[in-house]
Amino acid sequence: MTETTAHPVTTATGTDVRVRFCPSPTGTPHVGLIRTALFNWAYARHTGGKLVFRVEDTDAARDSEESYEQLIEALRWLEIDWDEGEGVGGPHAPYRQSQRTDLYLDVIAKLTASGHLYESFATAEEIEARNRAAGRDPKMGYDNFERDLTEEERQAFRDEGRSPALRLRVPDTDLSFDDLVRGTVTFPAGSFPDFVLVRPNGAPLYTLVNPVDDALMGITHVLRGEDLLSSTPRQIALYHALIDIGVADAIPRFGHLPYVMGEGNKKLSKRDPESNLFHHRDRGFIPEGLINYLALLGWSLTHDRDVFSRMEMVTAFDVADVNPNPARFDLKKAESLNGDHIRLLALDDFAQRLVPYLQAADVVGAELTHDQRRMLEAAAPLVQERMQLLGEAPDLLSFLFTTADELPYDDAAVQALKDDAPEVLAASRGALSGVPHTQWDIDLVQEVLQNTLITGMGMKPRLAYGPLRVGISGRRISPPLFESMVLLGKDETIARLDRLAGMLGE
């Protein structure tokens, strides 16, 4: 075995950069996982390098094809694309770990033949007993005592019917690396023992296959979550061996991205609703808004600007600018940013994006009628400036797609009306009845109601218009009142005021 302490670290820059996104297909896509994908994508696009998409699907008990399909759906929705990997192909196929067993077995054979791996027969009980006998903490772990077993000693274990695990012979030196996010990180010699890479049944562990895949695929920069920081020295130790046997050319650069925190400054858990990417999509986040917010979980464009496009992110993104401190998922800020991006949409694009949410709430059918489409196009400008989530559309707009007879009234809105509401409705109906159909426009409707309620009855606008808003929309909050009346038309507006007046008079 050759000296293992002075192996080169990659110097790849620009188009030579190769990053990877290699999730396990378990559960629904987590915002922390997608943030990792986004940062890798942005770095690849910024440098002109390549993003490799690899699937780590070797946990048969937890992995599922359904989770894989959800992951693909999430990436496509956010327009995070990749240059090589599953679904795209490339020179290093296959890109699923479950299909790469022969490659791992070949590397294991080379590592064993070169002396980097050695057989370990010890049981957990025997390891604890050795630690006790030496006066050490029994839970201290393995003490490397099998490094230099003779062939006779190994054969004796085999004769007992034992099958060996394979451990990596860890260099007896400090292991340091320059983390792209955190600076120099050093693990002193002896920080961890020789560790198992292959189970006694011959199955390679994640600690082997992940770095081997990175090496075989020429990955130059490993950008991943902070939770994997502690495994990095083991991977570097393995890289020393992989370079020795010609599987790798250099050690990649590592960058460990900060935790995403939830409420109470606890790490965002898969059990937290905020962690579920599809939960945000279902509520009405748009890709542009969610991408922007995920980018802010550890990075920023400038100190005084939070709203930016994905292309602005690509232009500016450098992993060296990522903040190592934990990033808190602030739902209110995320929603506010999403609203900013909603207002940046072209009006016709915005209107079209509302349709699935209106359909899901049965406000409109699978196919919009001509009248429904015209109503949506006319109403969209009234709500675009007010919405933070597309999922607000049914509550804000459903009243425009029904009739006076079928309009549902919010009980709380009706009960909150003042005692003079019937008088307000009657006066408004009388005034509006005198407006000719041909002159039913915003200016005249507003003028008539203002003269009647504000000037004539001496009411404050909030109290005067409250019953009218409930009357036409069924709710306390709606798009602008006069514009809504014009969209509904004179007859429908008066019919709705009459219906509410009738309800209050019962």
From Swiss-Prot:
Keywords: Aminoacyl-tRNA synthetase, ATP-binding, Cytoplasm, Ligase, Nucleotide-binding, Protein biosynthesis
The EC number(s) this enzyme carries: 6.1.1.17
Localization: Cytoplasm
Motif ('KMSKS' region): 267-271
Keyword Zinc: no
Broad class of where this protein is predominantly found: cytoplasm
Reaction it catalyzes: tRNA(Glu) + L-glutamate + ATP = L-glutamyl-tRNA(Glu) + AMP + diphosphate
Keyword Iron assigned: no
SUPFAM superfamilies from the UniProt entry: An anticodon-binding domain of class I aminoacyl-tRNA synthetases (SSF48163), Nucleotidylyl transferase (SSF52374)
GO CC terms, sorted: cytosol
GO biological process: glutamyl-tRNA aminoacylation
MF term (GO), any: ATP binding
Enzyme class name: ligase
Span of the annotated motif 'HIGH' region: 23-33
Binding annotation for ATP: K270
Gene3D superfamilies: 1.10.10.350, Glutamate-tRNA synthetase, class I, anticodon-binding domain 1 (1.10.8.70), Glutamyl-trna Synthetase, Domain 2 (1.10.1160.10), Glutamyl-tRNA Synthetase, Domain 3 (3.90.800.10), HUPs (3.40.50.620)
Record family assignment: Belongs to the class-I aminoacyl-tRNA synthetase family. Glutamate--tRNA ligase type 1 subfamily.
NCBIfam families for this protein: gltX_bact
Subunit architecture: Monomer.
Function: Catalyzes the attachment of glutamate to tRNA(Glu) in a two-step reaction: glutamate is first activated by ATP to form Glu-AMP and then transferred to the acceptor end of tRNA(Glu).
Protein name: Glutamate--tRNA ligase
Organism of provenance: Clavibacter sepedonicus
Gene name, Swiss-Prot/TrEMBL: gltX
